[in-house]
From Swiss-Prot:
Keywords from the named record: Ribonucleoprotein, Ribosomal protein, RNA-binding, rRNA-binding
Pfam family of the protein (one): Ribosomal_S15
Annotated TM spans: none
Highest taxon in the source lineage: Bacteria
Any GO molecular function: structural constituent of ribosome
Subunit structure as annotated in this protein's UniProt entry: Part of the 30S ribosomal subunit. Forms a bridge to the 50S subunit in the 70S ribosome, contacting the 23S rRNA.
UniProt source species: Shewanella sp. (strain W3-18-1)
Gene: rpsO
PROSITE patterns in the cross-refs: RIBOSOMAL_S15
Name used for this protein in its record: Small ribosomal subunit protein uS15
GO CC terms of this entry: cytosolic small ribosomal subunit
HAMAP family: Ribosomal_uS15_B
Length: 89
């Protein structure tokens, strides 16, 4: 259920600050969002997959914490990221 290498590279190129930026908050939130969207499609077919649903909830929680951190530290980057990813806030 993980993302392909090409998908990760595309996200890194779009949201990263530099060529090898894999740890910035924007990149982490974008990767989590892609994984969450992928899992949502999985759950449409596999309704009773509770083990993966727990992983999904952990990812959503991690994304929420990272976005809260970004909002607290740099509100401009936060609003730009939320608009770019199409998240509710």
């Amino acid at each position: 259920m993980s993302l392909s290498t090409e998908a990760k590279a595309k996200i890194l190129a779009e949201f990263g600050r530099g060529e090898n930026d894999t740890g910035s908050t924007e990149v982490q939130v974008a990767l989590l969002t892609a994984q969450i969207n992928h899992l949502q499609d999985h759950f449409k077919e596999h309704i009773h997959d509770h083990h993966s649903r727990r992983g999904l909830l952990r990812m959503v929680s991690a994304r929420r914490k990272l976005t809260a951190y970004l909002k607290r530290t740099d509100a401009e980057r936060y609003t730009a990221l939320i608009q770019k990813l199409g998240l509710r806030r």
